[in-house]
Amino acid sequence: MACDEEKPKCRSCTRRATPCTYTNSVGLNHLAKAAQASSPYSKPEPGSGFPPVPYNHDGFVLNGNNAVQANSPLPLAPPSPLALNMPHLELLHHFIAVTSEVLGVETISRQVWKSTIPQIALSHDFLMHSILAVAALHIAHLRPEQRRSYWERTAMHQDRALELQQEAMANASRDNADALFSFSLLVVYYAFASPKVSGSQEAEEPLAGAIQCISIIRGMRYLLPPIRQWVEEGPLAQLLSIHPGNMKSNHSFKDHDTELYFQRFLVLCSTSSDMNKTHEFEDIEQCAAAASTLRASFLTAESVADGGLKAPPIWHWACRLAPEFLQRLGKLHPIPLVLVAHWCVILAQVRQYWWIQGWVDHTMGQIQKTLPREYHEWLDWPMKKVQEQRENWSREGERIGSS
């Protein structure tokens, strides 16, 4: 069955859990259409209530003084060197003043997002477009009454960022290594936040959002090695210092019951009758490896909490998954679904951040509806832990509010 080239993601490829040849390599969902490079004007849908916004051919919004009427036969005049692009300045200011404070989970990371990365973006258009896209996405999240307008700007900047990043990645070097690394992080935040902000979350096929996020996180695994040495020698080296691979973890859980639970869980993932029926022994190995890596991520998260960091390494597990695991997840096989439900426990520890708000509950709900009933007992532990974290955050909020 051929790719039907349907956006945001073709249904044929989704049903077969195969990579879509029509989407770009990052595979992001975009509900809004990209601005047409051949036209200086965006074209909102009829009846949307939003007037057309003038763009130049690089995808940047033009100052109103340089706009040309839509029915004008004259070509778009180049903007004056003195013209200020207020829409871009608005987004950049918001990113530096507001968004940067709610991206990084550590003080060291927040300072990098606030100062270092915007400075790097001044020399790399693809990173600047990505920054503006995430800023617009954040504003759309904060201002529901203006969500449509800012989502259109989000999609336009993200499309342009992806286009320019492909060329930069093909020519990776010391000069653009930090920009590529920063971009890869922004794309992950974008992937988690965009379905809810755009309104596509309820319309997507089961687990489509989770599969997309995992796929993008896995992409970092291939992007980083060629540029890692340059990043380690540059201003973003401190971000690599908090990578899970650089953190020590315990060999077993402090809580004996948790240790016993994960021992049973590893047995389930290694001997599932569902997989034995199909004799797909390679898949059994992949799920067993995924379960073992997930246990290691929980141990690292427990050790990080003891060390005083405010959030666990939430992407470590997804980054190490094999492509075969994603294929089984796309087919909604039980063991991958149960594993993602357990990953949600780690993600729930950062649920206060805007870019992941609602993601855990939505994904857990989809898994509960999709998972065969005989496996539902394996949702009890992750659902209990997510509920405990929800109650802890609620109590913490009440404590702060009363202080």
Model-derived features: where do they sit?
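Short amphipathic alpha-helical segments and their helix-coil junctions
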Residues: 111-114, 157-170, 314-329
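N-terminal cysteine-rich, zinc-dependent DNA-binding domains of eukaryotic transcription factors
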Residues: 1-27, 120
